């Protein structure tokens, strides 16, 4: 039995609760309330873990596993980490998708003794639960991408999912409805770190697919966690509204998704949730659909290995701010599909491209701004420091300077859309002055260190700091005052551990002390000692000044933060403006740096790319002083399919990828790597390029290839762009040719969308004779005797060779192996010529490889019954493939 399934009695029995120490009983009580977490239990200067948590954490963190005494003769496993190094160790645990509960001491040992005697246990409780989707600390999350927590709720008919996603670090929250067939595609776009699901979905295909495809934590909740009435009340209470319509027209499942995510934040943050805005309602169709495989194959935001290097994002990202980098990440993850919105972005890019002088100045100034989105979240969640406030101050100051650039540049004719971006840059003088007058420039990270508030901001702060810095002077002043009052020039003020501060006079001067304010404390052989209420008060102030000033500074800091939070709406708008400026100036910069051009968009199936280049490959070649070989791509309603044959290693795959990437870059509002580009808006891009055996998932190369191809054919529309490379290569030649042929027919006749199709099956080139919207292209080469030069140019025509032996020779295979392979190839070519002609003849005569002459129907009662239960409109591609295998067994 796992811990999570234990009731309280079973749990206490397991750990011998009744005979445990009081401290260990306290630990067990808190652990039982957080069975799904690793519990970090504060013990003085360490956070300690016990029992199973300790064993697991010691392995993950690479720290020593020790023990803390015994319980019923059984040693208690224990490991610990220093409290000041907590974030370092949390990073490792969160990276492994663990959920961590932080249990802190809520009082000092001295306070505990006052409360309950010397045996009292310090009060402790969980102050926060940290999960992959609820992190806000800078050291624990990437500054370059969002950190989404997602709640997914299926509608009653299971045809749609409502997905609410929030980036707690920036206080951004969204809600979207997604068709059941598009759920994984939407999750691929979001790349969530943590997903909330109902326990009812625990054994579903959806949960299984999420675990296989995405590196995230799934947190299951009981079904009642998503109950409509409960979730609606949570929303009303959180946003302080009376009617659910106050957050917009949303469905029941959307209410459940939003309410459940707010409840989860409340549980993990212990009610300390930032002021989240009302969720922004997203139209799923407003973004281009790009599935998980395509994102991976095209290496849009990461490379195949999951790293940034070699990705499109890495090549395009010359932003100078963290929030600008995140916005570019969002743009690339979510290309637009609305022409008006795309053109609006392109016009902004064009404006800055036409004014590169101001772009250079803006980019330099933006380097002085801070990530105020995340600063503001830390402030609202009481996890900020004075440096967060200073960051806001410097950003306000810089924004005003940037705004001045536009005002000074009278020659600039500012379009309305630029005016909207720069309007928030005028700043907020009241907020700036508040921070400027109150927060010291050298403010520490830790409020407990003091020294955060300027002395002149508050008279009491000035007074207490004066005591701290000038305590001896105040004692000297009082001594001089008492000398004048008594006429005793030898009067001193001294200190010892028994009396503290005291007035010390010689015995012969005792008759001069006439004022009753001097209170006798002690008589020694040579002197008499006194005190006064004035001296006692000064001593108390000196002793407590440090504590008092830190306490006062915290109060003042909290009040300043409250006033900053009141300006949170403006600060978020300012952050959006600055990040937008950064991204569009970045687009202008790369357009100038790499000679990109403004694309043109249409509502038809146009796809005219002149002298297009692959941005990542080109950037890599430029570093070695080499140039990229550009290529054209022409697709249209009349010529929708480009069938490419040609040798290995000649650039087919690069050509396929570059045209898909150019489309994505264009639809995010950037100029593109081409001489010109005219594109009919693409609603979905699918890419089937290469495959590796996925033995862990039990899928061969061919099965993975067929599943991906099946999904592409099922989900594509007329406005989609399909990129296919070597379909059918994972099986026998004739099976492969047959599948590739049929797939091409389906795309041509049924989908009628644009498609780039690369293949080694030269037999497919004859399809141009009876598929009018298909055109043959090949890779240009130069042959000189046995030598071959790949020119990397895509030209009209066909190729009847793959030049595999030439590539093998380049790879360094032994000459004897190459020569023997050439002999074998010659024999195979002679054998296959006649067979190839037969295949082509059959295909040409029938127009489809699968329109064979029908055979007499052989009755199979089981097969008949199976067919009767199938609704072809409701089964998924994967289910269809499984049925084929099942029918094959029946036959």
UniProtKB/Swiss-Prot annotation:
GO terms for biological process: mismatch repair. PANTHER family: DNA MISMATCH REPAIR PROTEIN MSH1, MITOCHONDRIAL (PTHR11361:SF34), DNA MISMATCH REPAIR PROTEIN MUTS FAMILY MEMBER (PTHR11361). Belongs to the DNA mismatch repair MutS family. One of its GO terms (molecular function) is ATP binding. This is DNA mismatch repair protein MutS. InterPro entries: DNA_mismatch_repair_MutS (IPR005748), DNA_mismatch_repair_MutS-lik_N (IPR007695), DNA_mismatch_repair_MutS/MSH (IPR017261), DNA_mismatch_repair_MutS_C (IPR000432), DNA_mismatch_repair_MutS_clamp (IPR007861), DNA_mismatch_repair_MutS_core (IPR007696), DNA_mismatch_repair_MutS_N (IPR016151), DNA_mismatch_repair_MutS_sf (IPR036187). This protein is involved in the repair of mismatches in DNA. It is possible that it carries out the mismatch recognition step. This protein has a weak ATPase activity. Keywords: ATP-binding, DNA damage, DNA repair, DNA-binding, Nucleotide-binding. The keyword DNA-binding applies. ATP binds at residues 646-653.
